[in-house]
UniProtKB/Swiss-Prot annotation:
Catalytic activity: NAD(+) + (deoxyribonucleotide)n-3'-hydroxyl + 5'-phospho-(deoxyribonucleotide)m = (deoxyribonucleotide)n+m + AMP + beta-nicotinamide D-nucleotide
Protein name: DNA ligase
Residue span, BRCT domain: 587-663
EC number from the UniProt entry: 6.5.1.2
Binding site for Zn(2+): C404, C407, C422, C427
The family this protein is said to belong to: Belongs to the NAD-dependent DNA ligase family. LigA subfamily.
GO molecular function terms attached to this record: DNA binding; DNA ligase (NAD+) activity; metal ion binding
GO terms classed as biological process: DNA repair; DNA replication
Amino acid sequence: MSKDIQKKVEALREKIEYHNHRYYVLDAPEISDQEFDALMNELIELEQTYPEYQSPDSPSQRVGGEPLDKFPRVSHEIPMLSLENAESQKGLLDFHQRVSKNTQKTDPVYVAELKIDGLALSLRYEQGILVRGATRGDGTTGEDITPNVKTVRSIPLKLSKPLDIEIRGEAFMSKASFERLNQEKAERGEDPFANPRNAAAGSLRQLDPKIPAKRDLDFFPYSVPYIRGENLDSHYSAVKELKDLGFKINPYIRKFETMEEVISYCEEWQEKRTKLPYEIDGVVIKLNDYNLQQQLGATSKNPRWAIAYKFPAEQAESQVNNIFINVGRTGALTPVVELEPVRIAGSTVKRASLHNEDILRQKDVRIGDRVIIQKAGDIIPEVVKVKEEARTGHEQPFVYPESCPVCKSEAKRINDEAILRCINPGCPAQAKERIIHFSSRDAMDIEGLGEKVVEKLYSHGLIKDVADIYYLAKNELSNLEGFGDKSAENLLQAIEESKKNPFNKLLYGLGIRLVGKRAAQLLAFEFEHLDNLMKAQIEDLTKINDIGPRMATSIVSFFQLEHTHNLIRKLKKAGVNMKEPTEQNKSSDPSLTGKLVVITGTFDNYTRRELTDLIEAKGAKVTSNVSSNTDFVLVGANPGSKRDKAQDLGLTIIEESDLEDFL
């Protein structure tokens, strides 16, 4: 009986993987979705009934398992380096000239491939079985997200050969899947993702693998940094090997004999990029020959044998339907243009910021204007210019308000800023924005408390400030449209968990003007408890490196407000933590508080991320560039030019042999 069950399980797995490959890799399905689901359900039922036959390479792993507590950190034995960028033909020709000179090859062969806009992953297989999927992280240390990676249908759980191999590539979300996901989020009253890249990254970083399993993610491999027992001599041969192993390969990878052909390829895809079913933001060009790659080597940041041609920011024309004022959490009155919806760089743009009155006047944007817009860095929509030649004479200049458009309170420019601010701390618009900021990922990280939910809770009078979040009751939430018992429980659980956050996240969440995430960390480290910070004077604050007079004044002013004192009392009563963890207390090493540290090279006992965490836990700030303001330079193996610059500037250099004493 047991052998019959085992054979049935193995046959089902083989059949499911066959059809999975046909559908997700070859794009040539032979059975319907319903038939595929029936096979999967049968396998899951058998594995649950007979757990002794469960296997890490079973296709049932793709539906997602139990939620995780956190993602373990993993070190990349071969660093996942970033690529040098070229933004013009000249940049590509300069790259070609360097390659030709250093390899003594006048016409080296290149491989060009589309630069998919997604999340870089490292996949490790042992004996052909997927054993680890990790994010790039900072290039040396990433996160182990294996359960989530297994839900991506185009990533084989088992290769066609029993190889020990590492494969790197890009996980992404198609435009169609992105639109569907955002539609579903809108129907649930949740905030949409800004673009497909954020959607893919956000999905794969969910602690519950069942979430990415439902989000139709895809994957294209782009390199094989390690393979045991096989001799690959070129990038193009590696691509062919990946296809044979069962991966879906991007169909537009091309091999070229000249840089002129590469440039034509880049120009072609710059024009055709919008016609693809997924987002790309450039073209990656690699030297094909592995021996030549090895000969050129890499800097501490980039391989010398590859470059990324970055497309210019995508632009589009639209019409200004309206201009209105948005009131931010610190009272800033920001002019926003309401546009005829237009699609740019993976998302539909309906609004763009003009930042302040001066920029509005400088660009002379009027209601009814035809404008050119783009996404700055392909992220933030901005108005590039007005098409003055398209004006009809009916366009209306915008009259900037002298008071807050929401609460009608006085608006002022503080300290000659370009920004006009509402000075009423009780302004409803500010209150809502403060709550949204407070619950954001970098602050208290309250899952499910996005803009639309905050708007709903505020409009129903359930919350008026950030402290009210902690006094919400299940029956209040369950009675709201779009909420049920389960969603109410989930939100309340996320709120309860946020009470345990360290002081620095609470401090950042309070939204004090000029206090960003890094400043909040420095202040929390120095003062240890909110009560101590509330007593601080300007001179106490400016003693801390990176805390200037303007920020110090803003902090002291914030804690002098009666509104702030009432808020803190409510947060304390709710049980919100106001203390920084003891292991980060300054007593561990006060000599490093506020110091600037640069790390260069590689270290035997630490990854770069681990060193950064240790140093920042002691109150220092890790920066990437050596300057006269740098206090210490930590030097490992193969340090590059940073060591030389540190010596020229007479800076304190900490060798790896002295690292333990330093820490």
